[in-house]
């Protein structure tokens, strides 16, 4: 029977998992792309996608729900001001997980997680001068 197999435990306590995914969700919303291990990225989708769906409808109740889950005021403001309206016409599938090889030290599978349709980052003059 498959009872109790609803999520990946990732060898962490429930409070550690909650804090880790809260931090990762804030990082993803703030930077719109993060690098992490593949199992963490796959599990993070289950946290971030419902938050972006909340961000599409900026009611006070939705803002309070998002703040209760993220505990970061700047991330909630960005979620409702930028990210929610960007995905107003999209029904789910807001994130993309790209495999990027294995980590050098322990050979863990790594992944690059990003928001789809995110604006392209313009190269600065400092980057051009370095080349």
UniProtKB/Swiss-Prot annotation:
GO terms for molecular function: structural constituent of ribosome. Part of the 50S ribosomal subunit. Contacts protein L32. Transmembrane segments: none annotated. The keyword Ribosomal protein applies. The lineage of its organism: Bacteria, Pseudomonadati, Pseudomonadota, Betaproteobacteria, Burkholderiales. Belongs to the bacterial ribosomal protein bL17 family. GO terms for cellular component: cytosolic large ribosomal subunit. The keyword Ribonucleoprotein applies. GO terms for biological process: translation. It comes from Bordetella petrii (strain ATCC BAA-461 / DSM 12804 / CCUG 43448). PANTHER family: LARGE RIBOSOMAL SUBUNIT PROTEIN BL17M, RIBOSOMAL PROTEIN L17. Disulfide bonds: none annotated. Keywords: Ribonucleoprotein, Ribosomal protein. It comes from the Bacteria. This is Large ribosomal subunit protein bL17. The gene is rplQ. Pfam families: Ribosomal_L17.
């Amino acid at each position: 029977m498959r009872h109790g197999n609803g999520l990946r435990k990732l060898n962490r306590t429930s409070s550690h998992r909650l804090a880790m995914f809260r931090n990762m969700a804030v990082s993803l919303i703030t930077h719109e792309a993060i690098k992490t291990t593949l199992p963490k990225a796959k599990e993070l989708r289950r946290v971030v996608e419902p938050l972006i769906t909340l961000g599409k409808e900026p009611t006070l109740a939705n803002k309070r729900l998002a703040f209760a889950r993220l505990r970061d005021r700047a991330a909630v403001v960005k979620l409702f001001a930028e990210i929610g309206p960007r995905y107003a016409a999209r029904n789910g599938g807001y994130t993309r997980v790209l495999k990027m090889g294995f980590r050098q030290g322990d050979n863990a599978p790594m992944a690059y997680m990003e928001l789809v349709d995110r604006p392209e980052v313009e190269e600065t003059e400092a980057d051009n001068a370095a080349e």
